[in-house]
Swiss-Prot record:
GO biological process, any: regulation of transcription by RNA polymerase II
Record function comment: Controls the nucleo-mitochondrial dependence of galactose, maltose and raffinose utilization. Becomes essential in the absence of functioning mitochondria.
Modified residues (Phosphothreonine): 24
Gene Ontology MF, one: transcription coactivator activity
Bias kind Basic residues: ranges: 40-49
Biased composition (Acidic residues): 96-132
Keywords of this entry: Phosphoprotein
Lineage: Eukaryota, Fungi, Dikarya, Ascomycota, Saccharomycotina
Organism expressing this protein natively: Saccharomyces cerevisiae (strain ATCC 204508 / S288c)
Polar residues: compositionally biased ranges: 1-29
UniProt name for this protein: Sugar utilization regulatory protein IMP2
Length: 346
């Protein structure tokens, strides 16, 4: 078949100006035929895409089932190590499923791990779970408060229980002389600082640079942190700095004296509790108002270079949230006693 362009001459005759030879005949394709052909092509592409998606989904489902089985095994192994009181065994956890899959699926596993990052829980979250706590408490055949810290001659529970009657007798003995050794100073900007040095025996040894800083908010958990610090971390001849930050400027000096008195009575009680092990010790009680308590702590750490900064977990979650310093932080948490009621946890 030829395609040509006709040129009409003045005499009325026509001649071929240009012609193109076509090897295949051309056919006219209507709209309905074009639509039908497009549907067939799209159907084939959808079928191929569906097969590919089904393969990927089956692979992801198998991978998710394998990861879920591994997570269940890890949770059971974690609970087993906690109940056997051997947390070091968690360092040897091996993922058997990942070894069986081989090295060929490392890239696919990396993609799958990215999706499971939000679902995974840390060891602390699993141990601190309510169900786990109940199961762990059932397996423990002794009270954690019955432990005896190195500097105490009695258990923690006995130290805490003896505080109220001992402090009551101590307050009677110093009645009328509560503020004798407390120094109160007015600082620039209208800020106030109250300080008292409490010495046991000969005090801190000359040349002994070991010291600790305890940041307290006068709560019961902070008192427990002080008890743990005095019973487990302090050595002979050390110095302990107890820092309390008063958030509001007091209208009179009685508030600052009261803050020092609340800390002093617990320190004196702990002096009596550690008398069988520690003879010489210094404790500096400090209560003050300051615009930037975190900056104050960093300056004290830079100047005193303590062994560690000790505080309660409630302080870490409130006042010292996002706090960073150059020394280790010892966060002490007082686990509250739960009343076991039948039928509630079942």
């Amino acid at each position: 078949m030829q395609k040509s362009i006709l040129l009409t001459k003045p005499d009325g005759t026509q001649s071929n100006l240009h012609s193109i030879k076509t090897e295949t005949p051309t056919t006219v394709e209507f709209d309905s035929e074009q639509m039908e052909r497009g549907h067939r092509e799209r159907g084939r592409s959808k079928k191929k895409r569906g097969e590919r998606d089904s393969n990927v989904s089956s692979l992801s489902r198998s991978r998710s089932r394998a990861s879920s089985r591994s997570r269940v095994r890890e949770e059971e192994f974690l609970k087993w190590t906690v109940l056997r009181q051997d947390p070091s065994m968690r360092l040897r956890v091996v993922d058997v499923d990942s070894e069986e899959e081989g090295e060929g699926n490392d890239e696919d596993d990396d993609d799958g791990d990215g999706d499971d990052m939000d679902e995974e829980e840390s060891d602390e979250e699993q141990v601190s779970d309510i169900e786990n706590d109940l199961e762990i408490d059932e397996e423990f055949h002794y009270d954690l408060g019955m432990k005896v810290l190195p500097n105490f001659c009695t258990s923690i529970n006995e130290v805490l229980d003896s505080s109220k009657p001992w402090i009551a007798k101590y307050e009677i003995s110093i009645r009328g002389h509560e503020n004798e050794d407390v120094s109160l100073e007015q600082l620039d900007g209208g800020y106030v600082r109250a300080m008292q040095l409490l010495t046991k025996g000969a005090g801190a040894e000359a040349g002994n640079q070991r010291s600790f800083i305890l940041y307290t908010d006068l709560s019961s958990e902070s008192t427990y942190a002080l008890t743990y610090l005095m019973g487990a971390a302090v050595n002979q001849g050390d110095t302990v700095y107890i820092v309390h930050w008063e958030p509001s400027k007091p209208t009179d000096d009685s508030q600052m004296f009261a803050n020092v008195a609340r800390i002093r009575k617990h320190v004196m009680h702990l002096f009596d509790c550690v008398a069988g092990v520690l003879d010489d010790l210094d404790v500096v009680v400090l209560s003050l108002t300051h615009p930037y308590p975190k900056h104050l702590l960093n300056e004290m750490i830079h100047g005193l270079k303590p062994v560690a900064l000790c505080c309660s977990l409630s302080v870490i979650l409130s006042t010292l949230q996002n706090f960073v310093c150059s020394v280790p932080i010892l966060a002490v948490r007082k686990k509250l006693k739960r009343a076991k009621r039948k039928g509630i946890s079942e």
